[in-house]
Regions:
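Charged, gly/pro-rich active-site loop segments
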Residues: 1-2, 73-136
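Extreme N-terminal tail/first-helix region
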Residues: 1-16
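A generic local structural motif
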Residues: 3-6, 29-31, 49-51, 108-109
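Amphipathic alpha-helical interface surfaces
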Residues: 7, 49-52, 92-95, 99
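Short beta-strand segments
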Residues: 14-48, 64-67, 78
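A solvent-exposed, acidic/Ser-Thr-rich amphipathic alpha-helical stretch
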Residues: 40-41, 53, 72-75
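Short coil-to-beta transition motif at edge beta-strands of beta-rich domains
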Residues: 59-61
């Protein structure tokens, strides 16, 4: 899916995102993550093979939500994305340092020197909804 500009702006504005994956028993597992874009894929980085990554390796279905500021018809704006994720090895320090420029401050770094290469989650967007300028 080609992401609308309004969604791209929300995803790159430094709002914390809630990443929902599915545990083996079908229950939700929720993590707060920093997000960015790689083309039309949403990306987030992780130093270790956390439960959320193991969940994605078993079941690629994910949901991502974030509050985006502003109001529409008196309601707080929020963005919800449903999609499928895949995990790649390596690149976590570079992506986290890039995202630190948005989430912490210009010139900031996050990954310690010599950090393990970790993993990147790539989310292909299948459905966009919520309250805001992206509402279908």
């Amino acid at each position: 899916m080609i992401l609308p500009d309004t969604v791209r702006q929300a995803l790159t504005a430094g709002h914390l995102a809630h990443l929902v994956t599915l545990n083996k028993d079908g229950s939700p597992q929720v993590s707060i993550v920093w997000v960015g874009l790689d083309g039309d894929e949403i990306v987030c980085a992780h130093f270790n093979l956390y439960q959320k990554l193991k969940n994605v390796q078993r079941d690629a279905r994910v949901a991502l939500s974030m509050e985006t500021g502003g109001k529409t018809n008196g309601l707080d704006n929020y963005l919800v994305i449903n999609g499928r994720a895949r995990i790649t090895e390596g690149g976590a320090p570079e992506l986290l340092n890039r995202l630190a420029q948005v989430y912490i401050a210009p010139g900031a770094t996050y990954a310690p020197e010599g950090a393990q290469q970790g993993y990147i989650t790539h989310i292909t967007v299948e459905h966009i909804h919520g309250i805001g300028p992206w509402k279908e």
